[in-house]
C-alpha cells in the first residue's frame, strides 16, 4: 500500500485540491484557547513520570494541547452516554449495561504515541464522568519471538502480519460486547518478547485506549473477495500522532543512542549486544533498523491509515504539536 501524500509525510492543507474538506484544522494557539479556562490536573512531577525517553513533554504542552484533547474526548464520551439512554428509551426496554468507550491511538515508532496514550489516560481519569480508564498496547498481541522466527517474520516485527490479528480483534470485540472481564497479553520491552502466562485484566472500565502502530488498518480482503471486521470498526474515536518522516527517523536514532546508554546496559536486555557499540556503530545500526524495518513499515502500513483518524496531532521537530486536524461531524 503506497504512502499517502509527499514522501516526507507532510500533511496537505485541509482544503487541498477541493473547495471544502471533511476536516477542521486549528493551529496551536487556536487549539490551546479551547481549554484556556480549564485547570490542568497534572503536576510537573506527574508529567515527568509519564514522559517517554526523548519526549519534551512539559506543563505548557499538556495545558495547550492535551487538556483540550481530553476535554473533547470527554464530550464524545458524554454524548455516547446520551445516545445510549436515548436508544434505551426508543426501544422501550432496559438495555445491557453500556459498553466502554474505545479510543484507538496510532502512529509511528518513536513519534511519541505511547506518551500521548499515557497522558490521555491520566487526564481522562480526572474527569468525574469517567474515572476508570484502561490503556492496552498492541505489543502484547505480537506473536512470540519463537513463532516469528518459525514464520520468518522476526525482521518484520511490527508489520501487520507479525501480530495475532485474530486475537487482537477478539479482544476489542469482547470489550465492546460488554464482557465483565477481558484479558490482554503482556509484552516486555526488556526481553523484546511476549511474557508467557502473564495477562492484563480489563474489568469494564469507562474508557479503553488501544495504542499501537497498526490499530487503524483497514479490513483485509479475504481470498474469496470478502472483507471482514477490523479493529477500527469498534472504535468510538481515533487519534493519529504525526510528524514528518525525516523528523521521526531522527527521533528514532536519538532514542536508540539514549537506550544504548541506559536500558541496553541491562545484561538481561534483548538489546544488550548494542551497549558495547561505539557511537558511530550505534548510529549506523539505528539507521539500518529504521531504513529496513521501521521506515518501510511506516510508509507502507502506518502512514496510509492517518486519514482514517478522527483527530490528527501534527508534531514539530521539538516534539511540540504544531496543529490539530479534527474530522467534521
UniProtKB/Swiss-Prot annotation:
A Pfam family hit: PRK
Family per similarity comment: Belongs to the prokaryotic pantothenate kinase family.
Location in or out of the cell: Cytoplasm
GO MF annotation terms: ATP binding; pantothenate kinase activity
Annotated source species: Nocardioides sp. (strain ATCC BAA-499 / JS614)
Pathway: Cofactor biosynthesis; coenzyme A biosynthesis; CoA from (R)-pantothenate: step 1/5
Region of interest called Disordered, as start-end residue ranges on this chain: 1-22
Residues that bind ATP: 107-114
Catalytic activity: (R)-pantothenate + ATP = (R)-4'-phosphopantothenate + ADP + H(+)
Protein name: Pantothenate kinase
Key words of the record: ATP-binding, Coenzyme A biosynthesis, Cytoplasm, Kinase, Nucleotide-binding, Transferase
EC number: 2.7.1.33
Any one GO cellular component localisation term in the record: cytoplasm
GO biological-process terms attached to the record: coenzyme A biosynthetic process
Name of the gene this protein is made from: coaA
Amino acid at each position: 500500500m503506497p504512502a499517502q501524500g509527499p514522501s516526507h509525510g507532510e500533511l496537505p492543507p485541509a482544503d487541498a485540491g477541493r473547495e471544502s474538506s471533511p476536516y477542521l484544522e486549528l493551529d496551536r494557539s487556536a487549539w490551546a484557547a479551547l481549554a484556556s479556562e480549564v485547570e490542568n490536573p497534572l503536576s510537573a512531577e506527574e508529567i515527568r513520570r509519564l514522559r517517554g525517553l526523548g519526549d519534551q513533554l512539559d506543563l505548557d504542552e499538556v495545558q495547550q494541547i492535551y487538556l483540550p484533547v481530553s476535554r473533547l474526548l470527554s464530550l464524545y464520551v458524554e454524548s455516547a452516554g446520551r445516545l445510549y439512554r436515548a436508544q434505551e428509551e426508543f426501544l422501550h426496554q432496559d438495555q445491557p449495561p453500556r459498553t466502554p468507550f474505545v479510543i484507538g491511538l496510532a502512529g509511528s515508532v518513536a513519534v511519541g504515541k505511547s506518551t500521548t496514550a499515557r497522558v490521555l489516560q491520566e487526564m481522562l481519569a480526572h474527569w468525574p464522568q469517567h474515572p476508570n480508564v484502561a490503556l492496552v498496547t498492541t505489543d502484547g498481541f505480537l506473536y512470540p519471538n519463537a513463532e516469528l522466527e518459525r514464520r520468518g517474520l522476526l525482521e518484520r516485527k511490527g508489520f501487520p502480519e507479525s501480530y495475532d490479528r485474530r486475537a487482537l480483534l477478539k479482544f476489542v470485540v469482547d470489550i465492546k460486547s460488554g464482557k465483565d472481564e477481558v484479558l490482554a497479553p503482556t509484552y516486555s520491552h526488556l526481553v523484546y518478547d511476549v511474557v508467557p502466562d502473564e495477562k492484563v485484566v480489563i474489568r469494564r472500565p469507562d474508557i479503553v485506549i488501544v495504542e499501537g502502530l497498526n490499530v487503524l488498518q483497514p479490513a483485509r480482503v479475504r481470498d474469496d473477495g470478502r472483507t471482514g471486521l477490523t479493529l477500527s470498526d469498534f472504535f468510538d474515536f481515533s487519534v493519529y500522532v504525526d510528524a514528518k518522516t525525516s523528523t521521526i527517523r531522527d527521533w528514532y536514532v536519538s532514542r536508540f543512542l539514549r537506550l544504548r546508554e541506559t536500558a541496553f546496559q541491562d545484561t538481561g536486555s534483548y538489546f544488550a549486544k548494542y551497549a558495547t557499540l561505539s557511537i558511530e556503530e550505534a548510529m549506523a545500526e539505528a539507521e539500518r533498523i529504521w531504513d529496513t524495518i521501521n521506515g518501510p513499515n511506516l510508509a507502507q502500513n502506518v502512514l496510509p491509515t492517518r486519514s482514517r483518524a478522527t483527530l490528527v496531532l501534527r508534531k514539530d521537530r521539538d516534539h511540540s504539536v504544531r496543529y490539530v486536524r479534527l474530522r467534521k461531524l
